[in-house]
UniProtKB/Swiss-Prot annotation:
Keywords: Amino-acid biosynthesis, Aromatic amino acid biosynthesis, Cytoplasm, Transferase
Record protein name field: 3-phosphoshikimate 1-carboxyvinyltransferase
Pathway: Metabolic intermediate biosynthesis; chorismate biosynthesis; chorismate from D-erythrose 4-phosphate and phosphoenolpyruvate: step 6/7
InterPro entries: Enolpyruvate_Tfrase_dom (IPR001986), Enolpyruvate_Tfrase_sf (IPR036968), EPSP_synthase (IPR006264), EPSP_synthase_CS (IPR023193), RNA3'P_cycl/enolpyr_Trfase_a/b (IPR013792)
Gene coding for it: aroA
Gene Ontology MF annotations: 3-phosphoshikimate 1-carboxyvinyltransferase activity
Organism from which the protein derives: Chlamydia trachomatis serovar D (strain ATCC VR-885 / DSM 19411 / UW-3/Cx)
Reactions that this protein is recorded to catalyse: 3-phosphoshikimate + phosphoenolpyruvate = 5-O-(1-carboxyvinyl)-3-phosphoshikimate + phosphate
Functional summary from the UniProt entry: Catalyzes the transfer of the enolpyruvyl moiety of phosphoenolpyruvate (PEP) to the 5-hydroxyl of shikimate-3-phosphate (S3P) to produce enolpyruvyl shikimate-3-phosphate and inorganic phosphate.
Catalytic residues in the record: D310
């Protein structure tokens, strides 16, 4: 894991090698939640253990689930009727998924639930989801209309509502709630963004035998359904794979970088990033359970970020090495992640000599020779890992990457993985002068 020693020192290097990709965060969190709401005992193999996973597990235990960890697996005895518990308190840590999903599920209970989280979670929008839940009859008390903390309870009333699609997690949260409601619920999604991630939630519901009708972006759930226990092995995380792949793609090595533990049948949105890179000319071989990256040049261009918006930071780094300028667009949602990713990655890459400029809904990037610099993660795991890739492929100089404990959110063993691929990434030691003057 990224240790309490929170900074990384990165030197230009020539990555290559073979490695297993860590488990998917999105699948792990959904598996934990669905297992906790199922009848019987579910077994989840190869689960990602991270602060977000712990936040979800803690909340699910408060809803009556019993959890045992055995190695890299979880045995979860679910509580299919968790909605008549004593008043509850959910601390969501820094998990946007836990915040949105459990907020909506709390409306199935007449028992008030206090929902809060870390100070950084307060910047994650929740108002559009709360507005739709209120229209269905939810009772909500909050100090401010736009963030945690707040108290929420149901019951909801049968009916139809429109939900904002600006963040796909709003629609996913409502779909999960409607799936388990004792009465019919339907909703329409307005201007759905990040569509692959919503489809991933529906794939889960379908695999668990939940019935619903879908007419484009309108869904109807009949009510009165329940979940049965299941066994599931979490596949690799395409979002994390993007960083490892970038180590290899930009390398000057003659050897490939091979990423294992990936499923070509998976519906994760960031899987589409690899198809995009192939279209731009990158030498990538996509197998059933692995991806092979060969160092190669590739073109930039006009890139619609909506299908893989979480990849904006690493794609910004890659586009610095493209043969021609790039415009990343349709990425407004990137402003409301763990950081304003548009501003954050542009600011930090500019320190490294990158010609990276924010636009209204994305970035304009010109090919640039990057150099080492002192940069900061903005407490965002994807910004941190993207900057690590940039530092490894800088043309000169070391990079001090400050405040990297956030990487634990999705890739606790990122430093070990980078080193396995022969990237010179290590925890900060005292040989870098004047650290306290730069890393706050």
């Amino acid at each position: 894991m990224v240790s309490s020693n929170q900074d990384l020192l990165i030197s230009p290097s020539i990555p290559y090698g073979e490695i297993a990709v860590p488990p998917s965060k999105s699948h792990s969190l959904r598996a934990i939640l669905f297992a906790s709401l199922s009848k019987g005992t579910s077994i989840i193999e190869n689960c990602l253990f991270s602060p977000d996973s712990q936040a979800m597990l803690t909340a699910c235990e408060k809803m009556g689930a019993h959890v045992r960890r055995i190695g890299d697996s979880l045995h979860i005895q679910g509580n299919p009727d968790p909605h008549h518990c004593h008043p509850r308190y959910f601390h969501m840590g820094n998990s946007g998924i836990a915040l949105r999903f459990l907020t909506a599920l709390s409306t199935l209970s007449p028992t008030p639930t206090l929902i809060t989280g870390s100070h950084t979670l307060k910047r994650r929008p929740i108002a559009p989801l709360l507005s739709s839940l209120k229209q269905l009859g939810a009772h909500i008390r909050q100090k401010t209309s736009s963030s945690i903390p707040f108290t929420i309870h149901g019951p909801l009333s049968p009916g139809h509502v429109t939900i904002s699609g600006q963040d796909s997690q709003y629609a996913s949260a409502l779909a999960i709630t409607a799936a388990l409601a004792p009465y019919p619920l339907s909703f329409s999604i307005e201007n759905l963004k990040e569509r692959p991630w919503f489809d991933l939630t529906l794939d889960w519901l379908h695999s668990l035998n939940i019935s619903f009708l879908r007419d484009q972006d309108s869904l109807t759930f009949p009510g009165g359904q329940s979940l049965e226990s299941f066994s599931y092995s979490v596949p690799g995380d395409y979002s994390s794979a993007a960083f490892l792949a970038s180590f290899g793609l930009l390398s000057s090595s003659s050897k490939p970088t091979i990423l294992r533990n990936l499923s070509s049948q998976d519906s994760q949105g960031d899987k589409l990033l690899f198809s995009l890179l192939k279209q731009l000319g990158a030498h990538i071989l996509i197998g059933k359970h692995h991806i092979e990256m060969h160092p190669s040049s590739f073109s930039g261009g006009e890139i619609d970020m909506d299908p893989f918006i979480d990849a904006l930071p690493i794609l910004a780094v890659l586009c610095c090495f493209a043969k021609n300028p790039s415009r990343l667009y349709n990425a407004l949602g990137a402003k409301d992640k763990e950081s304003n990713r548009i501003e954050a990655i542009a600011h930090e890459l500019q320190k490294m000599g990158g010609s990276v400029h924010p636009t209204r809904d994305g970035l304009y990037i010109e090919p640039s020779r990057l150099h080492g610099a002192v940069v900061d993660s903005h407490n965002d795991h994807r910004i941190a890992m993207a900057l690590a890739v940039a530092g490894v492929h800088a043309s000169s100089g070391q990079t001090l990457l400050c405040n990297t404990q956030c990487i634990n959110k999705s890739f606790p063993y990122f430093v070990i993985a980078a080193q396995t691929l022969h990237a010179n990434v290590r925890h900060y030691q005292a040989d870098f002068p004047l650290r306290s003057s730069f890393c706050r």
